[in-house]
Amino acid sequence: MPKYALYAKRMDPRLKEEAASTDTSQKGLKTMYEEVVRRMFHFIKGTCTNCGLPGHSFRGCSAPVTSFGTVIFRVNDLSWNQADVLTKNSSSYTGFESYIPKLEVLLIQRRDSLGFVEILRGKYNPLDIEYIKKQIQGMTDRERERLLTVPFDDLWSELWGVDSRTSAHYRNDKEISRQKLQILQGGIDINEGKISLESLIKECAVHWNTPEWGFPKGRRDPHENDLACALREMSEETGIKKENVIVIQNIEPLCETFYGSNHVHYCHKYYTVFVKSNLEVTYDDTNLHMKREIGNLQWFSLEDGLQKIRADNIEKREILVKMTTLLRSFCPILHE
């Protein structure tokens, strides 16, 4: 008997009367079952896409804004075999100790810096000069120049894509963002005189050639669990399929929690993932999702990876240190 029929037999007597005149095929019973569930749980709000718990929405969630991702590593040595190391070297507890210098981690570079996106989205108060300075400090030199020289419509379309031209939501945000940027470009009168976007950029002593480097991650889709979200983001941003990786089991995700320069509390949870050294990973500009999300991706040694992640991003640098410590002391058994 189909499970839908089983539930139909147990349902409320009032619904049985309705069922008497309905289609009793499997498709009809499925529809009936879904209606029963809808009526039984109509009082429960949807599941929060941020924390994964029922009873509230994202906007009503008190947990930090949470993303899920992966720290992807490999041993850049085709001759390395963990089983061989463990069986032939009695002093090895993990199979990694002598290969730590050959461990590499996959980092992705953001397409646009966080500060550039924050200013272009208009998520700031034009009178909050200190906050605006922080966003400018995080931009690349090229992004600063573009804010001064490229028409706003072009910047907006490049940031959001073609959907931004027709979406009412984007259209409303666009006009607010345009007005704020025009205020900044025109200059703001304060006690010390007039401050403009150009003057703030000129006095900035911090310079970056590329946007931030980090790990693939993203927000959870409705009804998606943590690991599924992390592996989906990995696939979308790096092109690596979940079938080609080994997720290290029996360890908690590596976490970074912090308050952003926008004063929002964030939490990023990363699963540790192993891939074979011969797996090709390249930036694919024909992959629209990859092109929209990232600017580059590359394998780095642990030391070079620490250098690539910006010094002020302490929490993300600690993720790499934690992973190195983990592989020195914990023995994940890798198998096909």
Question: Model segments located where?
Answer:
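A short catalytic or substrate-binding loop motif that flags glycine-/basic-rich loops and adjacent residues
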Residues: 62-66, 99, 263-265
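Generic recognition of flexible, low-complexity loop/linker segments
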Residues: 58, 94-95, 202
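Unchanged
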Residues: 114-123, 133-138, 144-146, 150-336
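Intrinsically disordered, low-complexity linkers and tails
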Residues: 1-54, 58-74, 79-91
